[in-house]
From Swiss-Prot:
Name of this protein: ATP-dependent RNA helicase DDX39A
Species assigned in the record: Rattus norvegicus
GO molecular function, one term: identical protein binding
Positions of the Helicase C-terminal domain: 260-421
EC number from the UniProt entry: 3.6.4.13
Subcellular location: Nucleus; Cytoplasm
SMART domains: DEXDc, HELICc
Modified residues (Phosphothreonine): T171
Post-translational modification: SUMOylated by RANBP2; SUMOylation modification affects its ability to bind RNA.
Tagged with keyword Nucleotide-binding: yes
Coiled-coil stretches noted in the UniProt entry, renumbered to this chain: none
Amino acid sequence: MAEQDVENELLDYDEDEEPQVPQESTPAPPKKDVKGSYVSIHSSGFRDFLLKPELLRAIVDCGFEHPSEVQHECIPQAILGMDVLCQAKSGMGKTAVFVLATLQQIEPINGQVSVLVMCHTRELAFQISKEYERFSKYMPSVKVSVFFGGLSIKKDEDVLKKNCPHVVVGTPGRILALVRSRSLNLRNVKHFVLDECDKMLEQLDMRRDVQEIFRLTPHEKQCMMFSATLSKEIRPVCRKFMQDPMEVFVDDETKLTLHGLQQYYVKLKDSEKNRKLFDLLDVLEFNQVVIFVKSVQRCMALAQLLVEQNFPAIAIHRGMAQEERLSRYQQFKDFQRRILVATNLFGRGMDIERVNIVFNYDMPEDSDTYLHRVARAGRFGTKGLAVTFVSDENDAKILNDVQDRFEVNVAELPEEIDISTYIEQSR
């Protein structure tokens, strides 16, 4: 199918496609276009958003005190049901925006799915479902389920039949399969969310799935889309799903530098990478480390080498069964292992709060992937360190692209690094 046909498929519904039910709703606030710079701690607290007491209790339990700029800009409009298109750097708490906004508005009705959240990877879907569970801790009537490929669809169908969730998180392929098998009914969806939306809308096959799912939801609903990278080309595609959205672009896309993150490179031969990595792990102070490699084979081999050198390492890659991947992800998140070796599969949207060092053992294939990898360190405005190994001319070219695009200077790794520049000091 031609790109033009796909664009045309995104046009709005015909008015007679679905009976319109008049809804009592708060009039939408005027459209707001927000641009700004990131401030790690905003002066107002979450209480200013007038959230449900159950949500405020959960927020306190999670240790959040002040909303980030993205949360400050988006949440007041999002809880009124306004459509939101948001681009902001990794680690700024975008997930909490739609989780809190949808839980604030939800009125759980047995047997009805009210919230549908989709993202492009299984791991991210799993993580988002965990965020819903964290924030709905004091809302026992709200049921959350996550559905994605790689696990038995029969189990998913049983869950939908016997214990229908109010919040569904999943990947487009599995969601569409459940809809086609008539297990998942989307006729009562009031909130439609895409996280890392550019990844889903840039890939034509995934975009078609998203469009088909979108058409099966009611015309009147809230639509929210979020991403760390939102090119000027993809923004009009996003807008076709929305009605007069509030658009929040925190920082210009060419300046996606991460506050508090120190970025360095090391020039070396491919054969020298292991020795250099071991040396750095010996001398650097770290809470947790993520090491990115380019293939499953390298991932397995490097993790094995690290274990043999007595480093507490664990690997996650696409060659594993889904249950094993999620189990290992949870082990790392629970601090049972301090070093994770991963392929790009893990690079985007994963939120591990204790990670303060990221190694690009193999250079990422482009500047976007670089951003999503290094953003694993220094999330929520904390300090972190990113070290990239450069072993050939192509690596050097990509590093130059990163520096040009994001207007950052990635310097050569010095002999010694002041620990206070990349790790939070206890007071």
